[in-house]
Amino acid sequence: MYHPNMFESHHMFDMTPKSTSDNDLGITGSREDDFETKSGTEVTTENPSGEELQDPSQRPNKKKRYHRHTQRQIQELESFFKECPHPDDKQRKELSRDLNLEPLQVKFWFQNKRTQMKAQSERHENQILKSDNDKLRAENNRYKEALSNATCPNCGGPAAIGEMSFDEQHLRIENARLREEIDRISAIAAKYVGKPLGSSFAPLAIHAPSRSLDLEVGNFGNQTGFVGEMYGTGDILRSVSIPSETDKPIIVELAVAAMEELVRMAQTGDPLWLSTDNSVEILNEEEYFRTFPRGIGPKPLGLRSEASRQSAVVIMNHINLVEILMDVNQWSCVFSGIVSRALTLEVLSTGVAGNYNGALQVMTAEFQVPSPLVPTRENYFVRYCKQHSDGSWAVVDVSLDSLRPSTPILRTRRRPSGCLIQELPNGYSKVTWIEHMEVDDRSVHNMYKPLVQSGLAFGAKRWVATLERQCERLASSMASNIPGDLSVITSPEGRKSMLKLAERMVMSFCSGVGASTAHAWTTMSTTGSDDVRVMTRKSMDDPGRPPGIVLSAATSFWIPVAPKRVFDFLRDENSRKEWDILSNGGMVQEMAHIANGHEPGNCVSLLRVNSGNSSQSNMLILQESCTDASGSYVIYAPVDIVAMNVVLSGGDPDYVALLPSGFAILPDGSVGGGDGNQHQEMVSTTSSGSCGGSLLTVAFQILVDSVPTAKLSLGSVATVNSLIKCTVERIKAAVSCDVGGGA
């Protein structure tokens, strides 16, 4: 369906011969052009073939004569030079006859041209080496300044020399590596000096990384790095300030130590890591503290360790993976189901040599499970990216909470976590992901505790599964060999616009379904059923959302049915009338379809709802369904018919108003590493519960008033509450699992 090389990017020091025009090399109509059009008795410095450089009949004291060639002669000579820079005697004679020139004139012209190309290549090489040298010197000065300003975190006085020895050693190693890189480039450049234009130095030019990988679905995080909508400011993402100058040397030291720990943990097996039944490796905590006695200190009292490791091969180039992880908007976009909000506070280093090698960022982020019953995990950390000597890349996070003693005690701490990325052939990469947290999860709802304590909610398996699915989504969106099946969108522009619209819908849903500290959920307790949480917000001046008062409602419940069965039921348009009250029992037909990988359930669909009492189509629904090893989503939103016609024609999808609703389906954690005892009461009456059930979150968004300044009525809240409860009961009944008030 897609070509495996689609993610191969341009390499910074790729020396592959590349045909380049004169203008690409900086050749313009300057003095050098005038020089190369003169011949006759000029003497050049090049003598690669032992040819004599002067006309033997010319006397040394005789004044030089210059012969300016015609435009036709110059064009013919230039054309021949591109094909053969070193013509033999026979070829020179043929050229002289054709161009009405003396053989010696032709000979000297070619000698001058080769000398000019050699000098130009040397200048190009010198510019590159000078640029690298300047960057190296600037980086060196930055490290020296950080070291000179370092203070002791305990007494506030100047740091002792011995305390900074580790950083100084790292600085020397990094500088030596950069010098070796420059020497290597110099050797390669020297090898190509004097070669034809096809071996030009154009690939050596230093470019800044694009930093904006086109994911075919847009970049919906705003410029500050926040994803989705921001509803509050009294949380860690807003309260944490940028690091002070005295903090920066400590941050650098923490990042370097965390990188070393992450790489060792990624490459070490037993006894540090123990295998589990669900193919995830969990950390042996005793062995960890023996292997890494220093780290970031002992585990705080009251926190529980949670560490896992997972590996996978993904269809994405290693350079693009690094760009996604180091760009807060792309990272939040790809992992929108896990990262509810994220912000880069300060960039301490952008990297060297034009890429992310050595990049250092201070960040805050909020991680979530798609349910209002699971508190989010907020972290203040530094992210460090490094390319290692074997060519692999690593990106590591480590908490900086110790630098903010005035900050309220947090419920989570991030020990060195991140991933090791190794390049594979054909644009693939091997990713080894490590998540190592210390958490206080006592406030998690009992229904979700087995899932959280199994490590499936926030662990490495969920990150890797999400990454695999998103890489497949991107690969499928860029595929050109689309089969012309019924309802399949084959237009590249239409596919791109529809996928972009669908991703905005998914991100909006994910940012509003969890227990983010930015949300002001109100619990509506009712007798004999699940609690429904509601919140309201005003929508104004947003072309992607209808104006007015939006009421959001969400509830989570457990059913003793396998997640795959629930997912297949909810995504199937033929069974939609069994639970969707808004469809009024009408038939639902799929009008358009885009596959997002090899899994049939991963797709974007455009559905048409035919009212039960009319043959006329009166509603369109955009739906994206996605599933992976960690969970599933079915997200949808009503869309305007005229607006969708514009999108399917390749128009801008950002102006299509959406209010997404949908479902998040997670395993209950009672099988494959979870603590099933905590579900004993729920499954005691149902034999199928022993096989593992599903945790289902239902979330609706409804425009209750088109006037943003209007007041919300209690009747609107009651209507939405009734709607969501009726939907829950229909779903339970439809999957033959009506457990009443037992959820």
From Swiss-Prot:
Residue ranges annotated for the START domain, each copy included: 244-476
Compartment(s): Nucleus
Phenotype reported upon loss of the gene: Plants missing both PDF2 and ATML1 have reduced levels of L1 box/ gibberellic acid (GA)-regulated putative targets, including LIP1, LIP2, LTP1, FDH and PDF1, in the presence of GA and during seed germination, thus leading to a delayed germination upon imbibition. Double mutants pdf2-1 hdg1-1, pdf2-1 hdg2-3, pdf2-1 hdg5-1 and pdf2-1 hdg12-2 exhibit abnormal flowers with sepaloid petals and carpelloid stamens in association with a reduced expression of APETALA 3 (AP3). In plants missing HDG3, HDG7, HDG11, PDF2 and ATML1, increased cell division leading to cell overproliferation.
Disordered as annotated region, ranges: 1-72
Molecular function, one GO term: transcription cis-regulatory region binding
Induction: Stimulated during seed imbibition. Induced by gibberellins (GAs) and repressed by DELLA proteins in an ATML1- and PDF2-dependent manner. Upon seed imbibition, increased GA levels in the epidermis reduce DELLA proteins (e.g. GAI/RGA2, RGA/RGA1/GRS and RGL2/SCL19) abundance and release, in turn, ATML1 and PDF2 which activate LIP1 expression, thus enhancing germination potential.
Tissue occurrence: Specifically expressed in the layer 1 (L1) of shoot meristems.
SUBUNIT field: Interacts with GAI/RGA2, RGA/RGA1/GRS, RGL2/SCL19 and ATML1. Binds to AIL7/PLT7, ANT, BBM and AIL1.
Protein name, as recorded: Homeobox-leucine zipper protein PROTODERMAL FACTOR 2
Organism expressing this protein natively: Arabidopsis thaliana (Mouse-ear cress)
Name of the encoding gene: PDF2
